[in-house]
Amino acid sequence: MRGKFITFEGIDGAGKSTHIEWVAERLRARANVVTTREPGGTPLGEDLRQLLLHRKMHLETEALLMFAARREHIAEVIEPALARGDWVISDRFTDATFAYQGGGRGLALDRLATLEQWVQSGLQPDLTLLFDVPLETASARLAGAREPDKFEAESRAFFERTRTEYLRRAAEAPQRFRVIDATRSIDEIRVALEEIIATL
């Protein structure tokens, strides 16, 4: 039986990464679970991640590199794991590209959709958990945590557009998305996550 593919999404500071390993541990009771991330997840993908997070580049180049890293990730990690019957949890996937490069940067969504179709050949997550927080909350969580990368250092307006695009995508695909109110406590969020994963 083919495995299931779960993605965690949200703007920087939403707190999604805090819960990934917790969810993975819950799911390991019923399947082998592979945790991974984007950009990254493969040796080439991790090299591209460093370029994407720290080097200035044209907006189109940024989007193309995101999808190049994703193609490698799908071919080397995601598809083989799903074919084995493993479950895959990824810290970000294509929704992040639509949110950050489409919403935040303003790249045409139809161009991103063309790349998505080419690179993914129809692959979509079975479940996307969108951790949603107001900008003030996200900024407070990031303040002083570490040296910000290129995206974390973006403007408030950038993150407003990014968040708006995330929520638009969630509204367009309610069968796939579950929006998590990430202003709640860790314990409250985990109660909600427990209820969601019980339905898988």
UniProtKB/Swiss-Prot annotation:
Alphabetized Pfam families for the sequence: Thymidylate_kin (PF02223)
Any single GO BP term: dTDP biosynthetic process
Binding site for ATP: G10, I11, D12, G13, A14, G15, K16, S17
Manganese as UniProt keyword: no
Family annotation (InterPro entries): P-loop_NTPase, Thymidylate_kin-like_dom, Thymidylate_kinase
Annotated catalysed reactions: dTMP + ATP = dTDP + ADP
Xref: HAMAP family: Thymidylate_kinase
Function: Phosphorylation of dTMP to form dTDP in both de novo and salvage pathways of dTTP synthesis.
PANTHER family: THYMIDYLATE KINASE, UMP-CMP KINASE 2, MITOCHONDRIAL
Protein name: Thymidylate kinase
Organism: Cupriavidus metallidurans (strain ATCC 43123 / DSM 2839 / NBRC 102507 / CH34)
Gene for this chain: tmk
